[in-house]
Amino acid sequence: MKTMVAIPCMDTVQTEFADSLLKLRPKGLMMHCFMPCSLIYKSRNDLGQLAIREKTDYVLWVDSDMVFPSDTLIDLMADLEEGRDIVAATCHMRRPPFRPVFYKKLRMGITPAENEHENWDDYPKDGPFKLEAVGFGCVLMRTSVLETVINKYGDLFAPLPGFGEELSFCIRARGCGYDIWADPRVQVGHKASTIVTKETFEAFRRATEHAEGVQAGAEDHD
């Protein structure tokens, strides 16, 4: 069994990401492939083609600003071993309101203005669930999925009108008959940066005081 860890990136990667990658526990043979490119969809396309040429069995897509537990690959592989083809870890956007990159509904209209998508904030929490699209911060799939998508569409990640490359791939994969799954038990972090101001401090203090008040109220009822 051979897995390629596919990392589309620019010229640099986050230190925390590198630390996570070094600690990632393999299952079978594991190769790491960075593909620097200013066009991320092209980087993903090139990585997909490389995975096919290298005759890998699986591809773990990981963005270079992710932080993940050492058992991430093993846990997602267990989901595929139950008969799935594509499964995503739980990842959130790195800017407010920090929504999960899960899409309950995704429809491509005749024009981009008619496209539809529905975020899934209150997703199931007890085990893997099906959805229509995911972000690709951390996704494991069988390499055979890539071959099937290329054979039908000639491309993997080229953006469709009104959609980014990740959702465009999901549309193609579903068009090939694949289900897309996510596992809420596999949580990964999204490295973010922020500009800290007085408003940032005040918002954090209000949230902290509220949490402390809730905890104190709960203790009073014990």
Report residues per predicted region.
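Conserved catalytic core of nucleotide-sugar-dependent glycosyltransferases
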Residues: 48, 69-158
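C-terminal catalytic/acceptor-binding lobe
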Residues: 1, 144, 148-222
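Active-site nucleotide-sugar/metal-binding loop of Leloir-type enzymes
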Residues: 45-58
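Short beta-strand-to-loop acidic/aromatic patch adjacent to the donor-nucleotide binding site
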Residues: 56-67
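Polar low-complexity intrinsically disordered regions
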Residues: 4-8, 65, 74-79, 195
